[in-house]
């Protein structure tokens, strides 16, 4: 049998051999996002500040990387870089651990401190680093951060701190625990000297760091979904023997429960911090600031609604009913139409954030001002979220927190009041509604900064008064201010709600009545004006008052305020 055999052949080169290397495509390193499981090009992730471009997951970054993301290029001057930890307790394997972690991370310990500029504003800074023993706080971390606050106090600088930590460094025993008290004392001295402290919480911030300087900032920001807790979730689950709800102890949880001012994506942190630094220096941020309000195309146009009324109200009760109309300008509209910018801040630092009270720092014509407003909302959904402008105790406590900051940093306070009254409910009473209002009255009576309150709608009883102890009280001509609603007055005194009209007249709750009684200091005429025009009139009147009040020293200001309220009331001696 014949078999076909493949003939042996020799490959023949079609051209001459060369020694040049073949070109290969550039290598790409890919990383899988632990949140959405998407595979991401490492270079793209780096360009996006280590944030997943698909789901927004914020990856952990080193302290120096965060410094480069935040500080103006070429302005950072490091402090105390020569401090390094030592094994003073002869703790098993600690010395070896310090050596290996230092070699791997290139750092001597878990924090980088110094001074630099953010958006042109000078500030002291510290950046904690999770790559060094999970950012645990030992003697060096405590010493460097403590020195940072001391240097800032001497130089008159604010402090911006980025926290990330697994808690105390157990290898240093109780000495580690004492760093909490040590840093807190330095924070207090810096604050008493009038210094601003901004904290940025990053994932994770836990244990002794959370229970000390992480939560001591005047303003507390947080990256999205950052774990922030005293006891970590695993510890709580082991102790309680139950699974924790999704989102528990995360940034958004803190915001809802009143423990941080805002959750800010990494890409916006530098601009937001720069904006806040500028406002606390007494000047406004530059053009393009994150919270600038752009009014392009509004001038000369009636974009606001006119009040829907066929004729001017003829009775006091008609005025009261008009204040409750959904067509009225809300506090939020007055802020957005009347100011050049506004940074809303959240939380009472005790229980929650009350959506009925909108508070923050605004600016107009180059002048910063603390704004505290009661917001009813416009749509039904929003009105329900804001509890129809009836504030809870946490709303009044948030207001008091920002009033104290206004005094500390020398900003005037503008209050916009539109409420039927403080919320009456079981939870409000359990959390001390009366105490919250009472503390505001005491705080405002002695606050060493000018206060102007404007009743823009309904001024209902103690809930309105809690934001109306002021140097100047103004009312819109269409607003009302009363100890009780006419309906409630008629029901309580006469057991007849049909006599509400009579009660409204008797209560003397209109702006002209209250001006005649010496309760208020002026009336802003809003008849027939658009929302934009009303906002302009309110802000113009308020800032004119600030001009006058700003010429007074603290003692004169508070004494005149005391005498103003001391003189209210009429009686006869028997």
What residue ranges belong to the model's regions?
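Terminal-region recognition feature
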Residues: 1-198, 204, 216, 223, ...
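Catalytic-face loop-and-helix region of soluble metabolic enzyme cores
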Residues: 239
């Amino acid at each position: 049998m014949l078999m076909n055999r493949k003939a042996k052949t020799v490959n023949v080169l079609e051209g001459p051999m060369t020694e040049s290397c073949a070109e290969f495509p550039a290598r790409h390193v890919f990383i899988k996002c632990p949140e959405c499981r998407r595979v991401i090009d490492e270079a793209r992730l780096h360009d996006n500040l280590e944030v997943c471009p698909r789901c927004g997951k914020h990856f952990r970054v080193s302290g120096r990387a965060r410094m480069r993301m935040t500080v103006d290029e070429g302005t950072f001057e490091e402090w105390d870089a020569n401090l390094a930890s030592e094994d003073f307790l002869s703790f098993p394997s600690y010395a070896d651990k310090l050596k290996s972690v230092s070699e791997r991370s290139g750092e001597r310990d878990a924090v980088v401190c110094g001074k630099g500029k953010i958006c042109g504003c000078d500030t002291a800074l510290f950046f904690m680093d999770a790559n060094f023993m999970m950012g645990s706080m030992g003697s060096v971390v405590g010493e460097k951060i403590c020195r940072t606050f001391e240097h800032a106090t001497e130089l008159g600088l604010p402090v911006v701190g980025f926290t990330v930590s697994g808690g105390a460094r157990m290898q240093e025993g109780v000495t580690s625990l004492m760093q909490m008290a040590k840093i807190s004392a330095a924070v207090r001295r810096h604050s008493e000297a009038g210094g601003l402290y901004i904290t940025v919480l990053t994932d994770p911030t836990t244990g002794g760091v959370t229970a000390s300087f992480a939560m001591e900032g005047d303003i507390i920001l947080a990256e999205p979904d950052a774990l922030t807790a005293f006891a970590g979730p695993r510890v709580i689950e082991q102790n309680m023997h139950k699974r924790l709800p999704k989102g528990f102890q995360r940034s958004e949880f803190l915001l809802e429960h009143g423990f941080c001012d805002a959750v800010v994506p990494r890409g916006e942190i530098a601009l937001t911090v720069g904006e806040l630094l500028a406002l606390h220096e007494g000047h406004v941020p530059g053009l393009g600031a994150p919270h600038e309000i752009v009014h392009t195309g509004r001038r000369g146009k009636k974009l606001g609604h006119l009040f829907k009324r066929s004729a001017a109200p003829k009775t006091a009760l008609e005025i009261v009913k008009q204040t409750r109309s959904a067509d009225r300008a809300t506090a939020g509209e007055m802020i957005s139409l009347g100011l050049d910018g506004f940074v809303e801040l959240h939380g009472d630092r005790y229980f929650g954030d009350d959506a009925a009270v909108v508070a923050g720092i605004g600016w107009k014509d180059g002048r910063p001002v603390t704004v505290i407003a009661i917001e009813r909302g416009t749509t039904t959904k929003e009105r329900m979220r804001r509890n129809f402008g009836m504030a809870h105790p946490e709303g009044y406590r948030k207001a008091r927190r920002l009033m104290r900051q206004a005094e500390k940093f020398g900003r005037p306070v503008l209050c916009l009041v539109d409420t039927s009254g403080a919320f009456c409910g079981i939870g409000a009473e359990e959390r001390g509604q009366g105490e919250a209002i009472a503390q505001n009255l005491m705080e405002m009576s002695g606050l060493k900064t000018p206060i102007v309150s404007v009743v823009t709608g309904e001024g209902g009883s103690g809930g309105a008064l809690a934001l109306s102890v002021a140097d100047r009280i103004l009312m819109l001509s269409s607003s009302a201010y009363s100890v009780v609603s006419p309906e409630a007055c008629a029901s309580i005194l006469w057991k007849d709600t049909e006599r509400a009209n009579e009660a409204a007249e008797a209560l003397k709750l209109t702006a002209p009545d209250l001006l005649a009684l010496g309760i208020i200091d002026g009336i802003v005429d809003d008849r027939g004006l658009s929302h934009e025009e009303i906002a302009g009139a309110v802000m113009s009147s308020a800032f004119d008052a600030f001009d006058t009040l700003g010429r007074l020293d603290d003692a004169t200001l508070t004494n005149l305020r005391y005498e103003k309220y001391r003189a209210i009331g009429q009686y006869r001696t028997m």
